[in-house]
Amino acid sequence: VQYVDFTDLAMAENATFRVTAQKTTDLRELTNDAEWLALWGMADTPAMDTANAAGITGPQRASSTTLAGIMQELLDFSKSTKALELSGLYKSIDVDGQPTILSGKVILPAKGPIKRYILVSHYTIASNKEAPSNIFSLEGLLVKLGYALIIPDYIGYGATADKVHPYLVMELTATNVLDMYYAVVPFLEKAGCAPEHDDIYLMGYSQGGATTMAVQHAIEHHDKPIKIRRVFAGGGPYDIKYTYDQFVETNWASYPCAVPIMMQGMVVGNKLDLDMSKMMQPFIYENLDAWVNSKLYTAGQINTLLGSHVTSDLLTEIGMDRTSKEVSELYKAMVNNSILTYSWTPKAPVFMFHSMDDDVVPFENAMRAKSKWKNANIQYSFGHFGNHQMGCVRFIYTVQTLLENDEKEENGNFTF
């Protein structure tokens, strides 16, 4: 990529994607970025990893067996790379279907050709400082391989941080993600930065894993003119109702902030006429704006503020009663937004990753996906890969390896 001032007003005129900030990042600097590393719990005890005991082999088998170790391997892989980060704005729609301006980031190789686009649906975040347009996303390390990553913020972050995030509202979020792709592609073509190939990768973990499958559905079901080379989906809540129901059935939430965030996302994103104060404990409902909607706190900080993993400490009797009118309506919305309820079978090849030790998104989600899509072209990678956070880092490490192998195969020198 030749150096271009993408923030130049002449380029912004009639542009589909308006760049608001541009910088070149030396990825070696990330190892010294304490705040960035802290978001990945690098100061905490390494997450559980039983790769050796499970006999994990293949691309998902990093040589390290700790969160810090695999993070270091990812950073070492990318350390000689410089990336061009473009934060910007594009047009999409809001929860009412009305026009709105959303934000996101494009990460390009600072020099050399662009091979393909990777359209990334990001994992669950809570604070606005974690929004892709405000930070270097972990998936951005894949820029080392010559790919350009397109990473939307979603409604509720970046340019729309004052809005409630419609968490796991699949069709809307898939539309928002695709709208950024449609905005970025002509913009970069106009700037002389078109990729060498016109097929793309889709990628996402956790919330992003389910969202990236919804993006694939939106492309294939509606015959969008986008060629998908491969989809990488990891740790996704493909069955939202089942995922939420586990909080109620077991009376335990290892990731307690997910309870109010999922409830609010369904209510706001689906425009449900439900009084959340009847379902949430008063101290949560009264602090929902301050703790969640302010976007000032990370998920870990919100978990600390909530002070309990016991679901009945978070929800009222009505909220815990799956037969109540309120919860029944909530569950209907969750079913309607679950990708597994769609009358659709993925066409493009998919790599689906899920840790059997996942403590946030139950592994059963992946098993239900495997049962639902038994006739699809899906490669499943299940194993004891550690908890949800560890699974995320291992997933990105695995995608890196798969992309390297894909490149070798494309160049005719792939070896098994």
Question: Where is each model-derived feature located?
Answer:
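C-terminal catalytic histidine-bearing segment of alpha/beta-hydrolase fold enzymes
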Residues: 326, 331-333, 337, 357-360, ...
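Short, surface-exposed "cap/lid" segments of acyl-processing enzymes
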Residues: 95-103, 107-145
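Gly/Ser-rich "nucleophile elbow"/oxyanion-hole loop immediately N-terminal to the catalytic nucleophile
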Residues: 108-114, 183-203, 223-226
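Gly/Ala-rich beta-loop-alpha elbow adjacent to hydrolase catalytic centers
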Residues: 204-208, 212
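Catalytic-loop region of hydrolases
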Residues: 1-112
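Short beta-strand/loop motif that positions the catalytic acidic residue
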Residues: 346, 351-358
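Alpha/beta-hydrolase active-site loop
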Residues: 167-190
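Accessory cap/linker subdomain of secreted extracellular hydrolases
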Residues: 234-343
